[in-house]
């Protein structure tokens, strides 16, 4: 169930956030997710670094956000476990820092503790979370919900949560990039953005197509799994995640 509901959860995460303006696709997040004061701070050069944090699967999902965002903006972007930020990267004054905290439940102890520590030092926080009114949402300046923020049946295996966190992360990365760089210009930039967002919008149907081949997938797994002792999964760019 956690796997088969992934396309719907992914689609809910995107709903209403990708809009067509004059034939070009744009990301549109409301102020509850990306407040105007944070947008202005990015525009005015007030942020010098962005940390993307989480624990376990959420930290892995965060690496996709950091990878895309680091390609789009010139300020430093780093993805790391929450415990690493709280243990080794804190500064007395972090008012020039945005922390993006990712948590399915919004109650991840290490992540919430780290958020408390960075906020006490002046950092701003945007959270990507599934659970509405969870502890993390109350500690954040902005909240971007995965699914519709009401998907309480999330497995520890974290399949649909993981996919939805990646979707939300891409939307947020594009929004931050636009806040810093201003409106897109140049045909090549529009083409690149349209390709990314169109691909994102088409993914739920492609996921359903893959899941419809479950019987064939089982056959392939039964044939190959016993045949090899070591396996490697490789990729480049966003495909690393």
Residues of each region from the PLM?
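Active-site phosphate/pyrophosphate-binding segments
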Residues: 1, 6-51, 142-241
